[in-house]
């Protein structure tokens, strides 16, 4: 029988829920935290560095954690369990990259580090909160991937980890879906953040990039925050194992840009 209609995507859509967000100290991660908190969720802001905003008094808990270290992740999960006793939303956003070089020149140590944080970290965090989601018979895992998973750049190790993260997402969706746990990924396009700002300081490069995007603008962290909020809410309750591309139409316009005059 259908349940009574309730608007699933409102300002209090996440009231009473607990969200864990990694890579929360700035940029996209911080915007995700702001969106989830604004919709009523208690937010655990996880980063290897100190998070600049929020306190336990306003429903936000800051936790220092190295997502590539299993002991550090388990300690983070213990804090979530002790403070809230549940976890409804996990956003695996923590990631690192490297300077654009070909794989033939990329040191193996750097390759391994990128994989440890971007891929191993997502798995460790998901495994750590899984018992809470399993016991409460539900949860939403959102892995932040990238359009570089489908459109290779010279950030070879980064794009490879993001493609693998999408595969991991689908595996989680299939294995954990029967337990009420959804898993989806988000692939941001060009987003202007403090870390990416150097790419946009050259006016010529900036205008060229804007012209390649049908939306005719560079994305903002809030664009990703809104997409995560959708996947975290009941508005997406039947969405599982999918990748949501948030790029203003950039990837779809590749052939159009090729033949543009």
Feature locations, PLM:
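Short C-terminal tail/terminal secondary-structure segment
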Residues: 2-10, 97-100, 240-261
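Conserved glycine-rich Rossmann-like NAD(P)H-binding loop of the short-chain dehydrogenase/reductase
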Residues: 39-55
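Substrate-binding pocket helix/loop in short-chain dehydrogenase/reductase
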Residues: 101-103, 107-115, 141, 209
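C-terminal substrate-recognition "lid" of short-chain dehydrogenase/reductases
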Residues: 123, 217-246, 251
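Active-site helix of classical SDR
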Residues: 126, 161, 169
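Alpha-helical segment proximal to the catalytic Tyr-Lys
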Residues: 131, 174-178, 237
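Residue(s) in the substrate-gating loop at a strand-loop-helix junction
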Residues: 146
């Amino acid at each position: 029988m259908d349940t009574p209609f309730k608007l699933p995507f409102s300002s209090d859509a996440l009231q009473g829920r607990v969200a864990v967000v990694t890579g929360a100290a700035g940029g996209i991660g911080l915007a995700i935290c702001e969106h989830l908190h604004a919709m009523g969720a208690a937010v655990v802001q996880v980063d290897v560095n100190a998070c600049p905003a929020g306190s336990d008094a306003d429903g936000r808990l800051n936790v220092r954690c190295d997502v590539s270290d299993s002991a550090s992740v388990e300690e983070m999960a213990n804090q979530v369990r002790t403070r809230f006793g549940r976890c409804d939303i996990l956003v695996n956003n923590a990631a690192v990259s490297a300077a654009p070089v070909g794989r033939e020149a990329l040191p193996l140590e750097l390759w391994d580090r990128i994989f440890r944080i971007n891929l191993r970290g997502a798995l460790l965090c998901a495994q750590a909160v899984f018992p809470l989601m399993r016991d409460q018979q539900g949860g939403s895992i959102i892995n932040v991937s990238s359009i570089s998973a489908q459109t290779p750049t010279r950030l070879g190790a980064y794009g490879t980890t993001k493609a693998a993260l999408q595969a991991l997402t689908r595996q989680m969706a299939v294995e954990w879906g029967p337990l009420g746990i959804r898993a989806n990924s988000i692939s941001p396009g060009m987003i202007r953040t403090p870390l990416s700002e150097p790419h946009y300081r050259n006016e010529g490069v900036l205008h060229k990039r804007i012209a390649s995007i049908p939306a005719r603008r560079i994305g903002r962290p809030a664009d990703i925050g809104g997409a995560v909020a959708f996947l975290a809410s009941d508005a997406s309750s039947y969405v599982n194992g999918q990748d949501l591309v948030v790029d203003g139409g950039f990837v779809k316009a590749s052939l159009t840009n090729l033949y543009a005059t």
